[in-house]
């Protein structure tokens, strides 16, 4: 599927259809509205493209920017990089979200996920959406993950959530991968229930948050010093 890149908004993740994004998702707790032009990475393995990689980078960079700006405002904070999320608008998936955070926190060392009641770097939402589950950002530090009810019944819910969270940490989709690869998403089919990243995925996340974050932090510190 050809994906139209957005002017302002990008969506990445596990969508059951190849529909182009319109307004925000039809969630129980309405997710932020998106511009009409946006990109979606579908759940079907054939949906991948070079433009998908650009979409994923946009989401990752938005989250990194949000975290870096907070660190720049408080340089004396602990050395560990922490990405804060809100699960307030996805109460039905609270256990899966918590489990996903635990999985990633036990798998990588350069970044940690933690829930926050305010000032989160991204948020989870839930509801019914023909596009399925996906991650979206406006490219300016505001992002969210949408978890679709039907898709989370058809596929292992913890795997879906951990997969979407992988986009937050910088990983792209790789539908042709085996079940042992978390970012293969729905490629291996509904029988795949593995919610863990493999060694290559773990290594990649550690690299991204060691080098990519430092560059973003340097930029944020420079910007803060000019104020």
Curated annotation (Swiss-Prot):
Q: Which SUPFAM superfamilies match?
A: Metalloproteases ('zincins'), catalytic domain (SSF55486)
- Per UniProt, what is the name of the gene that codes for the protein in this document? snpA
User: What's its EC?
Assistant: 3.4.24.77
- Coarse class of the primary localization is secreted
User: Does this UniProt record's set of keywords contain Magnesium?
Assistant: no
The free-text note explaining how the cofactor binds reads: Binds 1 Ca(2+) ion per subunit.
> Which residues does the Swiss-Prot or TrEMBL record annotate as the active site?
164
Q: What is the protein name stated in its UniProt record?
A: Extracellular small neutral protease
Q: Which InterPro entries match?
A: MetalloPept_cat_dom_sf, Peptidase_M7
Entries under Gene3D superfamilies matching the protein: Collagenase (Catalytic Domain)
Key word Flavoprotein present = no
Q: How is it modified after translation?
A: The N-terminus is blocked.
Q: Which organism does this record belong to? A: Streptomyces coelicolor (strain ATCC BAA-471 / A3(2) / M145)
Q: Localized where?
A: Secreted
Family from the record: Belongs to the peptidase M7 family.
Taxonomic superkingdom: Bacteria
Q: Which GO terms describe its molecular function?
A: metalloendopeptidase activity; zinc ion binding
Cofactor(s) listed: Ca(2+); Zn(2+)
- Binding, Zn(2+): 163, 167, 173
Q: Which reaction does it catalyse?
A: Hydrolyzes proteins with a preference for Tyr or Phe in the P1' position. Has no action on amino-acid p-nitroanilides
Give all cystine bridges in this chain. Answer: 179-192
Keywords, in A-Z order: Calcium, Disulfide bond, Hydrolase, Metal-binding, Metalloprotease, Protease, Secreted, Signal, Zinc, Zymogen
Gene Ontology terms: biological process: proteolysis
Q: Which principal EC class is assigned to this enzyme?
A: hydrolase
